[in-house]
């Protein structure tokens, strides 16, 4: 459906073995694809092909190799095939499409199965995000720090009480 509508898709997985399974299926169906893992020799070439080709395609990326420093604005869909324990890594993956020059609305999907390990990881991610918001948010811990508190934190160990 997405291909027929002219959409390009990024598929992220933390497991290269899962990307291989998806790649084999897409190749069996003669679907255009690009592939990027830590073992990819021509990273720039794969990215350029995906960005410039007119034919809608799928870009399979490992979370670690494709999660940072890439600009993939020709995609309009992002699929996170399996969750990563650190929500920032997933956010970085989704952000590959949210760059200057993005002309499409971007839709991100996280694939989860009810009552699975992945669902529990997603719950832990949510708790981790809440903790960060509670500590660093507008009404969190850091907003109530005064100059004396900051001096204590930054200079701790310099005093004689040590």
Protein language model regions, located:
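ASCE P-loop NTPase motor core, strongest for the SF2 helicase catalytic module
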Residues: 1-162
